[in-house]
Swiss-Prot record:
Protein's name according to its UniProt entry: Protease HtpX homolog
GO cellular component: plasma membrane
Organism: Bacillus licheniformis (strain ATCC 14580 / DSM 13 / JCM 2505 / CCUG 7422 / NBRC 12200 / NCIMB 9375 / NCTC 10341 / NRRL NRS-1264 / Gibson 46)
Pfam families: Peptidase_M48
Keyword entries, A-Z: Cell membrane, Hydrolase, Membrane, Metal-binding, Metalloprotease, Protease, Transmembrane, Transmembrane helix, Zinc
Enzyme Commission identifier(s): 3.4.24.-
Family: Belongs to the peptidase M48B family.
Length: 297
């Protein structure tokens, strides 16, 4: 879990830190976009605008690249029935995703892919409903029966139909905005108590340190929302495939939680199967709790 969380946070921190540094350099050279006043104070409105630009540009850049990044990170082989000959199993997978997508009201079918892994898992990603991807592991296709596979696919299609990637991006943009804003307020306060000649370098280092600390705190909000959206996708999957198939899929996944790979941090929040035990930094709730909620529906 620690490695996954570290990589997830690091990727987000690197994006907003890089953008922040670039904009700061541009501001210092041109005077455009700087948030310091003439007497060394802070222009709160200018800083808030600066923070929003950094925060939302970073999150939307990640969204636009999400499908490509997932393919690269997971080694996804996209199945295209119009350009290649598919095996019976591959064609069946594509047909199921298309059937569920039409039932969910999607006007453009998602890309369908397979990635080579013993883990029993699947994920959905993409910048919009019209540019989405549903991918499953070879382990899932080998271990699960047809009803369980359909339940898993319905869950992933529900994520796309619900627009979860865009919503997560907006939330991450808001969190990033506050991280950038308060990191610079705190760094400015620290730089005021050191010698004047040291203030610029202290401010620069303090911004990075506070940005890391506040990003960790802000990630708690993102992870909490990620757990919340899993319940919605479960309900959506039950509507598409049937409640019994969705519950059967989750029960089947319980048997394979030990196989869930944690190194693909960039798509951890997108997968249907998380780790067995939930913590504040978990992207998924306990499977047993998800099953109980569906049964009570």
């Amino acid at each position: 879990m620690g490695k996954r969380i570290f990589l997830f946070l690091l990727s987000n921190i690197l994006v907003i830190t890089t953008i922040g540094i670039v904009l700061s350099i541009i501001g210092s050279l041109t005077g455009v976009g700087t948030y310091f006043t003439a007497n060394g104070g802070i222009d709160i409105v200018a800083l808030l605008v600066f923070s929003a630009v950094v925060g939302f540009v970073g999150s939307f850049m990640s969204l636009l690249m999400s499908r490509w990044m997932a393919k690269m990170a997971m080694g996804v082989q996209v199945l295209n029935p119009d350009k290649q000959t598919l095996s019976y199993e591959e064609q069946q997978l594509v047909d199921r995703v298309y059937k569920l997508s039409r039932a969910a009201g999607l006007t453009k079918m998602p890309e369908v892919g397979i990635y080579n892994s013993r883990e029993v898992n699947a994920f959905a990603t993409g910048p919009s409903k019209n540019r989405s991807l549903v991918a499953v592991s070879t382990g899932l296709l080998q271990e699960m029966d047809d009803d369980a596979v359909e339940g898993v696919l319905a869950h992933e299609v529900a994520h796309i139909a619900n627009g979860d990637m865009v919503t997560m991006t907006l939330l991450q943009g808001i969190v990033n905005t506050f991280v950038v804003f308060f990191a610079r307020i705190a760094a400015w306060a620290v730089s005021r108590v050191v010698r004047e000649e040291l203030a610029p370098i202290v401010h620069f280092i303090a911004v990075i340190v506070f940005q890391i600390v506040f990003s960790i705190l802000g990630s708690l909000v993102v992870f909490a929302y990620s757990r919340h959206r899993e319940y919605h996708a479960d309900r959506g999957g039950a509507d598409l495939a049937g409640k019994d198939k969705m519950i059967h899929a989750l029960r089947s996944l319980e048997q394979y939680t030990s196989r869930v790979k944690e190194e693909q941090a960039s798509v951890a929040t997108l997968k249907i199967n998380g780790k067995k035990h939930t913590s504040l930094f978990s992207t998924h709730p306990d499977l047993s709790d998800r099953i109980r909620r569906l049964e009570a529906k």
